[in-house]
């Protein structure tokens, strides 16, 4: 199974002009799977739709209806829901299911490749579908192993909520309203790229280096970034001082103010789930106080 965080897009329930082209772009940009949910569709319409894609593209598709067509057209998965809960004879593709509480997750987890849990946030596409869980409930479910890499978050998912979703232990995120509200925007492609990049970075441990900046790259944050990269991490930095040095000597340093150091740590913490911190040069008492305050504020792992 894909070790990266999964990004899944569900189609809108109705047919849209230009939908095939949009889906092809989504698949080319690297979404994990496309879930095809068209509850009112007729079989000829679904056949026409599936015939519009290559075999490789259909392998990334998961059907919510017409499971026999999934077999016939080589789709990669089928998704159980209140309408359809059968498994075609001889089916060996992916199998997924929608869940709406923790009891369902525990009951179905062993039988499926992955499960959707909804609604994590207030729905964007469905009025009246409010979030069903508190943050504390999701944290507890993660700690108890109920939410794990085989459970994907659905409901109100947007790019700026992914860090929170992945911090709760979800193995993927399921988009619907957020994606389709942007499909005709000139920034659609860049937004999808940002979503996928966020998912990729969530899989790579983010390590924060708090240290001086060495223009020769032999020490300081520059050296730390190389080391972090070499062990498979993603390096983040908060510079405590600008140093005037080379590989032979340090001539002098210019301390960064307490507030500026704190602001650096704050902005990276807003964007990334920091998994470790490496502390180097802290040239003044102010910089020591800034780091102590940041460690207390953001609860970085030991």
Task: Locate the predicted segments by residue.
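Glycine-rich phosphate-binding active-site loops on the catalytic face of alpha/beta enzymes
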Residues: 78-89, 116-129, 159-198, 236-244
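Active-site mouth loops of central-metabolism enzymes
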Residues: 4-20, 96-98, 153, 209-218, ...
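Catalytic cores of alpha/beta
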Residues: 22, 61-76, 80, 100-111, ...
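Catalytic beta/alpha-barrel core
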Residues: 10-13, 32-45, 54-107, 113-119, ...
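N-terminal beta-loop-helix "entrance" segment that forms/cooperates
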Residues: 43-51, 242-259
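N-terminal glycine-rich anion-binding loops that anchor highly charged ligand groups
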Residues: 25-31, 231-244
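Glycine-rich phosphate/dinucleotide-binding loop and adjoining beta-alpha-beta core of small-molecule
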Residues: 250-302
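Alpha-helix-loop-beta-strand connector modules within alpha/beta enzyme cores
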Residues: 47-65, 90-102, 130-153, 192-199, ...
